[in-house]
Every structure is written in structure tokens, then in C-alpha cells.
Amino acid sequence: MVHAPAKEAIPLLTPYKMGQLELSHRVVLAPLTRCRSYGHVPQPHAAVYYSQRATNGGLLIAEATVISPTAQGYPDTPGIYTQQQIEAWKPIVDAVHRKGALFFLQIWHVGRVSTTDFQPNGQAPISSTDKQITPDDSGMVYSKPRRLRTDEIPQIVDDFRRAARNAIESGFDGVEIHGAHGYLLDQFMKDSANDRTDEYGGNLENRCRFAVEVIDAVVAEVGAHRVGIRLSPFDNYMDCFDSNPVALGSYMVQQLNKHPGFLYCHMVEPGMAIVEGRRKITHGLLPFRKQFNGTFIAAGGYDREEGNKVVADGYADLVAYGRLFLANPDLPRRFELDAPLNRYDRSTFYTQDPVVGYTDYPFLEEIDEESTTTYA
């Protein structure tokens, strides 16, 4: 089967200059937890997975990677705090760079989204609060957290700083600070999860202080031109939401703008609406896009049509794709040809298999070869 390139202009596939970095297209691999880094050490199969999704001039954001032993909350997620982990990332980064792609590492602390099983010496997870996450429908029960003391916070800030330095040592082109989805920085920023009475709680400025200190430290360590952040002000995930998400997002963007050359702001859409029977992205990020001085990346359920539209309209510079990129290693090529997409298998998202649901999703050419094969 021969696929002809789509005739209409494809905004997602136009070049873009992000700071001093030249991108050949706007389709970004979103950071996706895959739980295949055994013992929290990146494995050789990750080099296959990421290089499959790498294109010349493309941007990949690696899966959320823990910054310290207390940052863990899921099985077999990678770390970036030991020399063994730093060395293990190097061949993975090299494999991506050989394809001509840019590679950023998302640095992460889960906070209270953890259990004592994942914590050093079985201690309680740390958070902005001592309030436990309400058990969800899956039956997962997270341990009751311990509220961080004020004098402990500088150590966590330094853990982020060292993680950024280690990422650059591994060869990454930069880092993305994980400030989204109900994890530690989000727990401090959002008023549903921050009930502190010290300088890290109360008003908006205080609640954002920890995240701002992390940003400042990481920028000072590796340079603003190597730093992005992911934020989800509208998110209600892991009992973590804010009473005024627009004010929260706007304040954080203002803090990013204080760092000339801060590379990108990666934000998650508020959600979906049903319009004429179709799921439509609500496009609630426009105020932040207008305020931010750097590259703006939008994420949250985008398909080819929606991605093209927001780039063409100037709503976003780049669009991050998660599940579609997971299931289609050649996603930019498929978008170019407007070709059918592989369906993702949710049951294999977080298994530990190094191949199934990880590196075995077929490329378009493989499907075409199968469809034209005849058997005697």
C-alpha cells in the first residue's frame, strides 16, 4: 500500500526554533511513565523505545524520573540521583541523538503519591500536608504522608538541582521540571493539598514559593536555555486541585518570565467537552500562552486535526502527544501521510515487559509489508 503525503499544509510538520534549538516539526513525545527501569535503573530496552520515536529535529521528553530515594511512588521508574543511573542513561541518550533528535529529561518527586513500601526504611512519604489521598476506584491506597518541616525544603530543592546537573552529565539537552498532576510541587501549589501555616502555605505566592525555588535552583545550575516545566493548573488529580487555577497558572508564568530565555512552558488542557457528539479540547490555556515569553507546549488529548489547528492559530508552538506516540513510533510520518494509527493497548502501559506494549508497536512500513504479503 502506498501512502501519498496529505495535500493540505500541515502546521504540525513545519520547522520551529525553540531558543537556540532547531526543530524540524512540532510533534513532541510527552513524558510517559512506563515502569520498565528495573530497580530504578534505566535499561537497554529504553534505547530501542526512545530511538524508535526519534526523528531528525524532533523533540522527545523522557519519562518522569525520580530525583531521590524519597521521590519514588511507582514500581521500576527510573532515577537520576546515583552514578549508576547517570551512566545507564548515557547510551539511551546517545541512541536518540544518533537519530538527530533532541532529548529532555523530566525530573520528578511524587510527594504523597506513594506508599511506605517505596520509601527508604519504610518511612512515610513526604508532602506539603499530612492529609492522605482519598482511595480511588482502583483500590489503590496511598500511605498517610508526613508534612515536610520548613527546614527540610531546601534539601528537596537541592535534590532537583542535582538531578538537573546529573541529567546534563548523562547527555540530555535539558530538563523538564515536573510541576503537574498532583505530585510534590503541585501539592504545594494547590490550595486543596496545601494547608501549611509557614511561608510555604496560605496565599498564592507562598504556595508557589517551593516551585519557584526549584525553578531558580535548576536555572542557576544548568541555564534557563536548558529548562522547561510542566504545569497543570486545572488538573484535579490525586486530590490536588486549586480554587483559582487561572490565577495559579498566571502567577507561575510570571515567575518563569523572570528568567530570560526560560526555554518552554508545557501545560495540560483543562479537559474535554462534547460538541456535536465529538470530543473537543476546551482550549483553556490561552491566557497563559499570551503571557509566557518562551515556547509554549500544549498537551491533553490532541489528535492530528486539533494539533494542526492550535499550531496554525498560534495557540501553541508545539503539541505533546502521549498515548498516540506510545502506540505509533512513527507518529510524525503518519501525520504527514494522514495514515491510520495503531490503537494503544492500555493494559500494557505499566507492565514490566521490555518488548510487549513497549517496542513492538509496528511502523507504517511494517503494516504495509504485511498487507501485501501473499502466502502459498
Curated annotation (Swiss-Prot):
Keyword Transmembrane helix attributed: no
Instruction: Keywords in alphabetical order, please.
Output: Fatty acid biosynthesis, Fatty acid metabolism, Flavoprotein, FMN, Lipid biosynthesis, Lipid metabolism, NADP, Oxidoreductase, Oxylipin biosynthesis
What processes in GO biological process is this protein linked to? jasmonic acid biosynthetic process; oxylipin biosynthetic process
Q: Where does FMN bind?
A: 31-33, 64, 106, 230, 301, 322-323
- Which SUPFAM superfamilies does the UniProt record give? FMN-linked oxidoreductases (SSF51395)
Query: EC number(s) in its UniProt entry?
Result: 1.3.1.-
What is the protein's known function? Putative oxophytodienoate reductase that may be involved in the biosynthesis or metabolism of oxylipin signaling molecules.
Protein's recorded name: Putative 12-oxophytodienoate reductase 2
Which organism's genome codes for this protein?
Oryza sativa subsp. japonica
